[in-house]
From Swiss-Prot:
Species of provenance: Bos taurus (Bovine)
Domain called SMB: residue spans: 24-75
Pfam families registered for this protein in UniProt: SBSPON_C, TSP1_spondin
Domain TSP type-1, chain residue ranges per copy: 74-127
Cellular compartments per GO CC: extracellular region
InterPro entries: SBSPO (IPR039942), SBSPON_C (IPR056801), Somatomedin_B-like_dom_sf (IPR036024), Somatomedin_B_dom (IPR001212), TSP1_rpt (IPR000884), TSP1_rpt_sf (IPR036383), TSP1_spondin_dom (IPR044004)
Record's protein name: Somatomedin-B and thrombospondin type-1 domain-containing protein
Signal peptide: 1-20
Superkingdom assignment: Eukaryota
Presence of keyword Glycoprotein: yes
PANTHER family: RPE-SPONDIN, SOMATOMEDIN-B AND THROMBOSPONDIN TYPE-1 DOMAIN-CONTAINING PROTEIN
Glycosylation sites: 227
Places the protein is found: Secreted, Extracellular space, Extracellular matrix
Keywords: Disulfide bond, Extracellular matrix, Glycoprotein, Secreted, Signal
Length: 264
């Protein structure tokens, strides 16, 4: 039987008209389509009605040439667009970036990945250019990885070269947090999963989160004696929030990457 099957395959290559299949019928159909069939040899070596729809891989009744006539093609997407600006000024909100589909998946090819990503952000200037955003009492934080992309002078025209590097690091010991942090699994908010009660975390204060006059970050707890309970909130999911207490101020953060954050 195997010899017969190999002979049929060779015959199909040398004399395509000898065997009907998906190519001869001009059929390649997505999903399950009972009307997408031809007459010829099937891949299970049975002659008769064979199918050229995507579901035939599961049912085992594909035409012998399905893989060649209907190759799987993966979804292809373009590059990410630049990040948008914050949706609004002077309060925690979100920015977004998108990418477009250049080729839809075909014949069971790899499906398209996410076409949109959102990340938390906070604008520190009104449309009129007035300073804002520093009046928030809680400390708004995000992962320190975001600091690599943040443009330090974007929010305020008052920054000078001498104040650009006036940053500092605050160490806190987390006291409590909501269960919503552990539920985050989106690519840009997955860092919230690593927030834990009782751990010491580092939060970097750098422009533009740093006020250009006071050289302080809102919610830094610098005036706390260490016994005061302070509040924090994760940018990107307002339900991920909690409390911590100040440990100390240091010049450079030295916490592990998963416990390193920045003020926003």
């Amino acid at each position: 039987m195997r010899t017969l099957w190999m002979a049929l395959c060779v015959l199909a290559r040398l004399w395509p008209g000898a065997l009907a299949g998906c190519a001869d019928a001009g059929r390649c159909c997505p999903g399950r389509d009972p009307a997408c069939f031809a007459s010829g040899w099937r891949q299970d070596r049975v002659y008769g009605t064979c199918f050229c729809d995507q579901a035939c891989r599961l049912t085992g009744d594909c035409c012998f040439d399905y893989a060649r006539a209907c190759p799987a093609r993966p979804c292809i997407v373009g590059e990410w667009s630049p990040w948008s600006g914050c949706a609004s000024q002077c309060r925690p909100t979100a920015r977004v970036r998108r990418r477009a589909v250049q080729q839809e998946p075909q014949n069971g090819g790899e499906p398209c990945p996410a076409l949109e990503e959102r990340a938390g952000c906070l604008e520190y200037a009104t449309p009129q250019g007035e300073d804002c955003g520093h009046a928030f009492v809680p400390a708004f934080i995000t992962t320190s990885a975001f600091n690599k992309e943040r443009t330090r002078q974007a929010a305020s025209p008052h920054w000078t070269t001498s104040t650009e590097d006036a940053g500092y690091c605050m160490e806190f010991k987390t006291e409590s947090l909501t269960h919503h942090c552990a539920l985050e699994n989106r690519p840009l908010t997955r860092w919230m999963q690593y927030l834990r009660e009782g751990y010491t975390v580092c939060v970097d204060c750098q422009p533009p989160a740093m006020n250009s006059v006071s050289l302080r970050c809102s919610g830094d707890g610098l005036d706390s004696d260490g016994n005061q309970t302070l509040h924090w909130q994760a940018i990107g999911n307002p339900r991920c929030q909690g409390t911590w207490k100040k440990v100390r101020r240091v010049e450079q953060c030295s916490c592990p990457a998963v416990h390193s954050f920045i003020f926003i």
